[in-house]
């Protein structure tokens, strides 16, 4: 697994990024845990609050003259002469250019596109606010963390001292009842100093996974583009 980290550091460094390869001791120092064998860090990285960021983008777009229609699912897209005809339950729209950015929620509007990804059900969870002592010992630098496991471990802090983590769906029966225990156990394996783990908030949805783990840009027709397959990193990749 360290070969993956070494490869990433080499790739990013060639492009001028400020990156650092971490041995086990340095990783333990940064994360407050000996759970990982090593890793790498992008020193210019950061985190955003996704909902606040989305609202900010919407406000900026509206300020530049964009019109945003919510609760208006497009049910079909067809070429009509030199434009595209988009139908919704309440009306129609004609456009010179169309961008389909529905990712894991791509439906029968573009069936071939839908079959190009694997929808994976992903859960995220936020703990109760944790004590100052815990916050000083668990990822004290407040970096966002993820690893190379298939069902990767990931962690980040919120402004009010909650640890956010999660997992992909493995349980078909009662997932919201069973996952908190599963994820809580993972937290304690990585950070036993947290003690009892309880989650105040749980949210979930689909991510669009691709076989090569890269997002795909498709040209579906004249002026008709699709962006799909963000593999759980849509906020960063789409920005």
Place the predicted regions along the sequence by residue:
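Generic structural signal for well-ordered, non-membrane alpha-helical segments
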Residues: 2-5, 20, 46, 50, ...
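General small-molecule cofactor/ligand-binding pocket signal
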Residues: 20-22, 67-69, 198-202
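Flexible hinge/switch segments at interdomain interfaces of large molecular machines
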Residues: 26-34
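Active-site substrate-recognition segment that forms the wall
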Residues: 74-76, 81-84, 88-222
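Ligand-binding pocket scaffold of soluble enzyme catalytic domains
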Residues: 68-70, 104, 224, 237
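Conserved mid-domain beta->alpha element of the FAD-binding
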Residues: 199, 216, 222-239
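A short alpha-helix-loop-beta-strand transition element characteristic
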Residues: 11-24
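Helical element adjacent to the flavin cofactor pocket in flavoenzyme catalytic cores
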Residues: 3-13, 34-97
